[in-house]
């Protein structure tokens, strides 16, 4: 099997989980015996481009002629079984779908964000969820609010690109939705069920989990959409020390809020930006990982890392978070799903304290979800603290069954193998 993996890498100065996932997926496919032909561009190339190449940048999101020429040559020479597209912006363009189809090559796309509709890709503006461009032929609100790179001109270009390529996106042969929430987004966009497959990302297996640590870990970009201010508000509603330690890892514009909270309360510890070893140590030191996103977060990798280490997750009920903790679907193996765990907790299972689940807290196989509100999160913190020992084994089991690299890679190869022989036309 021969697969072209196409991706426009985000700038290295802007840490990107998507870049990491693409690199990992290429390595896993190669290890599984798939011949991978990377077709990679990087936004870091832009400053060193020639004047002529820079002159074409404004049209690159729509067409990107150099990329189409190079891709045509690659497809002609190697005749791959499929093209797997990740991010096309700005140097590849969605036009690569048309180029692949012109060569008779079917296209798979992994959907990492909401940029079929939303120019910023995250459905979030000015501190709140925004879906003003849904259902519009042209995303005029995105232009008005400078949603793409805080530029009216660049927002106009992106909104135009999305309008021009609506037919292109609807011609993709198979969409990989990272969670059930992304699958719903694609259905709303007009993609039929038979062209959507839910396949999450994976993280490497860290091995059998260490014993549960103490308290909570929040690990994310310190920006408004990731909800660190929501978490700190909820945390302050409990006496100092009542919930153990809150460890916060990451960096971003809201770092001063975290540093102030750490100076104010001895039960808040700011860890800064961590490397891989630091991430593992922080996860192992904690009992519960928190994902407090205020937007429809597609697939926070920190949740999969938590499950791999046998740590249940307390998250907001937005985007892919309910799917990740198993709170959005029927249970799988008997005795391990949300219904069984809920029954065990309500009946006084280990770590439950013997009390019923409070209203407003959704219980999943591997964690809890609540509304993105301070009072709701504050109410769930002691529930998660008490219930962590019960959910820790099922958190690890969910990782092994759903997010382990071997499972996910096999699923991806099956997606390639079941593509239609004749690609669609836009």
Which residues fall in each region the model found?
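Short alpha-helical segment that forms part of, or immediately flanks, the ligand-binding pocket
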Residues: 280, 303-308, 319-326
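Short alpha-helical donor nucleotide-sugar binding micro-motif in glycosyltransferases
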Residues: 75, 273-274, 282-286
């Amino acid at each position: 099997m021969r697969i072209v993996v196409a991706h426009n890498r985000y700038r290295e100065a802007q840490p990107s989980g998507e870049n990491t996932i693409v690199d990992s997926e290429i390595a896993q496919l190669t290890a599984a015996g798939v011949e991978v032909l990377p077709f990679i561009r990087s936004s870091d190339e832009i400053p060193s481009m020639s004047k002529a190449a820079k002159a074409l940048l404004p049209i690159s999101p729509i067409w990107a002629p150099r990329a189409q020429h190079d891709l045509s040559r690659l497809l002609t020479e190697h005749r791959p079984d499929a093209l797997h597209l990740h991010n096309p912006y700005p140097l590849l363009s969605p036009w690569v779908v048309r180029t692949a189809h012109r060569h008779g090559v079917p296209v798979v796309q992994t959907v990492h964000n909401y940029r079929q509709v939303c120019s910023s890709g995250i459905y979030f503006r000015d501190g709140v969820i925004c879906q003003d461009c849904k259902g519009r032929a042209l995303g005029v609100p995105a232009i008005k609010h400078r949603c793409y790179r805080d530029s009216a001109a660049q927002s106009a270009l992106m909104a135009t690109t999305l309008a021009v390529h609506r037919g292109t996106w609807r011609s993709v042969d198979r969409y990989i939705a990272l969670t059930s929430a992304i699958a719903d987004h694609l259905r709303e966009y007009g993609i039929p069920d038979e062209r959507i497959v839910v396949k999450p990302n994976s993280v490497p297996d860290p091995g059998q989990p260490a014993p549960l640590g103490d308290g909570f870990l929040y690990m994310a970009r310190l920006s408004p959409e990731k909800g660190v201010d929501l978490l700190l508000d909820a945390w302050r509603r409990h006496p100092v020390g009542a919930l153990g330690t809150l460890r916060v890892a990451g960096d971003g514009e809201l770092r001063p809020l975290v540093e102030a909270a750490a100076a104010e309360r001895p039960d808040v510890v700011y860890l800064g930006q961590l490397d891989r070893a630091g991430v593992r140590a922080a996860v192992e030191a904690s009992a519960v990982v928190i994902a407090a996103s205020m937007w429809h977060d597609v697939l926070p990798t920190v949740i999969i890392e938590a499950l791999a280490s046998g740590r249940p997750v307390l998250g907001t009920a937005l985007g892919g978070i309910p799917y990740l903790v198993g709170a959005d679907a029927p249970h799988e193996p008997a005795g391990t799903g949300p219904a069984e765990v809920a029954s065990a907790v309500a009946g006084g299972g280990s770590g439950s304290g013997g009390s019923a689940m409070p209203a407003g807290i959704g219980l999943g196989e591997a964690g809890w979800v609540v509304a993105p509100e301070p009072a709701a999160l504050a109410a769930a913190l002691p529930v998660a603290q008490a219930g962590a020992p019960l959910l820790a084994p099922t958190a690890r089991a969910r990782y092994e069954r759903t997010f382990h690299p071997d499972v996910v890679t096999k699923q991806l190869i099956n997606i390639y193998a079941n593509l239609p022989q004749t690609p669609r036309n836009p």
